[in-house]
Structures are given as C-alpha cells and as structure tokens.
Swiss-Prot record:
PANTHER family: UPF0102 PROTEIN YRAN. It comes from Nitrosomonas europaea (strain ATCC 19718 / CIP 103999 / KCTC 2705 / NBRC 14298). Belongs to the UPF0102 family. Gene3D superfamilies: 3.40.1350.10. This is UPF0102 protein NE0719. One of its GO terms (molecular function) is nucleic acid binding.
C-alpha cells in the first residue's frame, strides 16, 4: 500500500511524463523556498510553466481542482516570483494544473492557465 507521500510523488512523476509527451521540457521538480513549493516547473517554447499536480481518489469533496484554493494559488504565485527572481531574463509564465483522478485509472486532465497572478 502506498503512503500519501508516495502517491503524491507518483502523481508528479505521471504528470511530468504526460507533459513531456506534450512537448514541454522539465526544468525542476519540487522547487521549494520560504513561500512554498511548486510541484513541477516546465518550459513550453519560451514560456515558463508552473504546474500544480493534484490527485484525488474521489470527487466527494469537489475533486482535485477544488483543492487548489485561493490561499494555495497565492503561495504558488509568491513561490513562482521567487523562482523567477533567481533567473536572469524576462520570461513569460503561466500557471497550469494537472489533475489526476485515481478512481478512473489515472485519468489526467491538463488545465492550461488554471489561474493567473491577479
């Protein structure tokens, strides 16, 4: 039986592989700073893509998408700004979500521009 940490890591691995099949390039996994953590940082053409990966075994509490709250979005935005501040250049960026429904044979839903900085 997998622990919650292993399931999260498995979901991130699955999401990274899926996005790489979509021609995105993996830059970093589990980027951490004092503001929070970003599961995956990818690049699509010249755009830096910050990816939140969510796995839910049921939709009982709104499913994976509902778990990305306004507070979580705020932490992701601050963490992304920290990441960008450490890299030279002015890169366009966006925030995507990859939702994995464990109760449907790992059905993957990729939401581009899941939220913005406003």
């Amino acid at each position: 039986m997998s622990s919650a940490g292993n399931k999260g890591s498995d979901a991130e691995q699955c999401a990274a592989a899926f996005l790489q099949q979509q021609k995105l390039t993996l830059l970093e996994k589990n980027y951490r700073c004092r503001f929070g953590e970003i599961d995956l940082i990818m690049r699509e053409d010249d755009t830096v893509v910050f990816v939140e990966v969510r796995m839910r075994s049921s939709d009982r509490f709104g499913g994976a998408a509902a778990s990305i709250t306004a507070a979580k979005q705020s932490r992701l935005i601050r963490t992304a700004r920290h990441y960008l501040a450490g890299h030279e250049g002015d890169f366009p960026c966006r925030f995507d979500a990859v939702l994995i429904s464990g109760n449907r044979e790992n059905e993957i839903e990729w939401i581009r521009n899941a939220f913005d900085e406003s």
